[in-house]
């Protein structure tokens, strides 16, 4: 399938509305888990549990880095699964039963401080990240297996991104508000953990239940090992460039996400400022999403991605002038970043879904979960590394950790580091991603004859007839 959404595309059969909406509910989980740990956890460790910045960064980074190994394995296991209920939905249920309680326990730490507190949080966070991988990898795979029509995949992803915006807005605004309600006390963080766990459960169980009515028009074929999965990715250059571009942009977003609470507290002068900052970031997500979708249809997804990436870079640079221009300038810069962020949430996923379809046509293999497992592993590592990178900025600039009962003044170097880490560093990362976006070319479909049958290695579920290879379509060739 072409990576740009053309207005003259041949329409395919639509999925039931309840399936599209129900699938989107899963983003209440993915959006919340991608937001709250990155937003809250580092600050919780350094400003509530008195964990030194470098140690706190390791406690946040290492459990998420574990997902780099877990995600591809989950994808391979899911691909081979013959569980009752299909290859994907049972994993959604397992994740739904385990992630919410584990998340609540992260913020229910016993009265520990320093390295001991960091160890407790790291272990619980590692278990929670594993449970999240069990849910997320099959969840991200499902659109490519529900339909082979790119327009219908766009509609599915539209619901997903819409609920993603709701999840980020709710969790990003409510989690800090609850955590700060009692002066950053451990009790307020425990309450926050329970509230977020309820939101996670709502989205995860909702997606599991409603996708029972989803058709299965395709089935992925797993690569036999992690090495084989990486080899498959190396053989598909469009996927490599696309995944690399998104990894750098996710790292930039992860750095910003880790720094926003510090930016609110020390640059804007109020911990509560994180709530209006999130309103400025996520408000545009819902409002401008149709505009990004329209731009993708008119100019192609890659052209729209260029616009979103450049706008994100400009907003990040503008944010660096907040100390001189005042809070109003900072909020305006975050609005620009929010408009760009809406595009960055939609467009790479659309390109990924169509790139997976192109891989089927070229190779005759259905490896959606293999590629999405690698994609989510890279994304997870990027967001985790974002918190670690910002923690390193704090450590290098002399940030002083404290507990909830004893606040300390920060040196001027640390205050400057917070502002630069929130603005200049993400801008540099976004700029580097533009080279990979430039190298990306929409894949050409045509190496597999449309009349040919799928290779014997493609598994055919007993409940489904053999699936034909998608028809040839013309797009640009990789350089």
Predicted regions and their residues:
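Intrinsically disordered, low-complexity repeat/linker tracts enriched for polar/charged residues
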Residues: 450-451, 455-456, 460-461, 465-466, ...
